[in-house]
């Protein structure tokens, strides 16, 4: 009986557990402390620091099943997914690792035993072929003499392009660093194929199933390597590939987990061919999307969020392609969790969040997908040179949310190319327009570059004696400044906190003798701190000894809001769930703003619950403790950290009893009671899946409540009732207004009927075509539209133009029946009005509207329009019209 994929995964772990390996869980898809990777793409990623010698080994032998994602860079698998047998965005990598424990002989022996022994995978030995690095004679002999592989089943692979160590069988982490030869195990699907030159032939019958890397050298340069004292083993075997082998299928998409998913997707369509490319793409993409969202990545227009959005939209487009009309993608999540078995633990915890996130993204994109596809298909039909312009591709990207690779995917199916250069030019032009639009002033100080440091003493001191090291006016270094000059001053040490981590910079003053410099803002410049402000008396010279003194009241207000921000983050996670994760913040002296991930709606009851939790912590007057810990210690204490932030090995951790633990470099109040009061003043949605809360604390919160009290008093006065009766009084007023609106509507309908009868007498009949032009004065626009639409229904062949005069301008509504639009259109008529009366407007062939027309030109335009339309109608033959 064939093993299931879930059984194969567990068998691998059980085997290496018997070989005294410690089973280590899969690390996050988001690499920790590794800015070189967007996503975890190999089993060794979580052990990179051990291979580099940056960390001491924790276990000599470990084994893992690592979740991996490959969508860009060297491993750009996205465009190949579904079209090949073995490309995936998400996959599971089986691996065993040794850190200065066993080496080549044991690693090869273990691999062979697992693959071929009856107890384990029981693969026919004759179907396995081996590649080794040509200079790695030791490995070759282990395969030949110990494992007893026939020589014609072992292939030596040399370097490419005569470049030493540049080989498929020589692994390296980078241009320098740990490296070593590797040996690969291949499975031959074809019994008749006996070629020992299978790699050069690119023979599809041979599939690489396991790569064993021997990390035994340190690369010093392109041509020089030296032996490592501590040698390691790094292996990788794709779960999907080995499952295909053990289930005797020649494509990863034929294994049990994919077949179940594909079958589920096909239930949404009339397609029963499970080899359909779109079905395979959707099956692959639901896996990567679900696991990314489970890792707290949400769809957005940048960084990892945009990768997720691209994958989702690619899947949705393929759903559309195979005829799925309704939202379907999010409905696959429960089936995915059931199918994935043990590896779906993280998905089970986040099931509702994953579903909700996918549903929102699907609804949003479905609103633009059809329109975008119509435009793209029209451009493809028009294309004479088999190329879509960069401007069109960018228009689809910018207006309809089509990622460029999605447009490319559609075009490649029809052998159409994209002008990527033109796309990038259009994208850059848009960036420039945006930057010009948002640039209200030039920040000259951003160009200041100083290769120096400044000691920050502001955690403990409000005042510091300092030395002036540099002075800049705009971006130019100067030796001194005089009264009235604005500058940025750099000191050797300071008590001023620089703008950082969402907290605004301190204000205050720098002074000595008769010189006084008012600091208006403080910013970081590399490892130093700039004090921006204006000298109001005396002069300041480089190397002057001065005092730096912060505005204590200003700092204190900031500290209250910063500590309150930590309370808010913790309260949000208690009320909304652990997926409410910080995405941005602003901590100022007047208020705080907090952006966080959350895909659902937040109701008033939840807001009040959050406020109650925070104010309860404020009343408990807990001590706020700050400790400097190693990053490892902080993680053990489950301190909250920002995913994309690069932390040092030593970090500052803020503890608010057992309620909140966060990594933070900002300033805080000593006790929660100092905050006094916390009040949320605004809750909004910043973008898809990102919410924002704004709040005030202390005196600002009291002032806010006073304003609300004043508003209530004013409303009470206007309604002539007590505060407690306001809601009841407003309900009565609403009922009265609704009754009056009904009466008004009835009167308006009567007025409309009267107007229709009156206007019917003004119709001109030209060769069987009804022409009606009428001018109203300050008439209800909604009623005008109702009248014109009713007349259009009654007058089967007609052109109707309504003009509504106001004090300084006039508006125009035009309707033309469908049987006339081949001769005269509403759009053509409105364009005459726009051109001659300097107005604005637009429309379609049957319907057009405009406004802002110059009223002085109305008589002249009416005469012109009447004569122009009459001439057009005189030339029309009406015998073919359908009355």
Swiss-Prot record:
Keywords for this protein: Aminoacyl-tRNA synthetase, ATP-binding, Cytoplasm, Ligase, Metal-binding, Nucleotide-binding, Protein biosynthesis, RNA-binding, tRNA-binding, Zinc
GO BP terms in the entry: alanyl-tRNA aminoacylation; negative regulation of DNA-templated transcription
Free-text remark on how the cofactor is bound: Binds 1 zinc ion per subunit.
Top-level class of the enzyme under EC nomenclature: ligase
Catalytic reaction annotation: tRNA(Ala) + L-alanine + ATP = L-alanyl-tRNA(Ala) + AMP + diphosphate
The enzyme's E.C. designation: 6.1.1.7
Any one GO cellular component localisation term in the record: cytosol
Main location: cytoplasm
Alphabetical list of InterPro entries matching this protein: aa-tRNA-synth_II/BPL/LPL, Ala-tRNA-lgiase_IIc, Ala-tRNA-ligase_IIc_anticod-bd, Ala-tRNA-synth_IIc_core, Ala-tRNA-synth_IIc_N, Ala-tRNA_ligase, Ala_tRNA_ligase_euk/bac, DHHA1_dom
Required cofactor(s): Zn(2+)
Any matching Pfam family: DHHA1
Binding site for Zn(2+): 562, 566, 664, 668
Quaternary structure and partners: Homotetramer.
NCBIfam families xref list: alaS (TIGR00344)
Domain notes: Consists of three domains; the N-terminal catalytic domain, the editing domain and the C-terminal C-Ala domain. The editing domain removes incorrectly charged amino acids, while the C-Ala domain, along with tRNA(Ala), serves as a bridge to cooperatively bring together the editing and aminoacylation centers thus stimulating deacylation of misacylated tRNAs.
Family (UniProt): Belongs to the class-II aminoacyl-tRNA synthetase family.
Protein function: Catalyzes the attachment of alanine to tRNA(Ala) in a two-step reaction: alanine is first activated by ATP to form Ala-AMP and then transferred to the acceptor end of tRNA(Ala). Also edits incorrectly charged Ser-tRNA(Ala) and Gly-tRNA(Ala) via its editing domain.
Protein name: Alanine--tRNA ligase
Originating species: Buchnera aphidicola subsp. Schizaphis graminum (strain Sg)
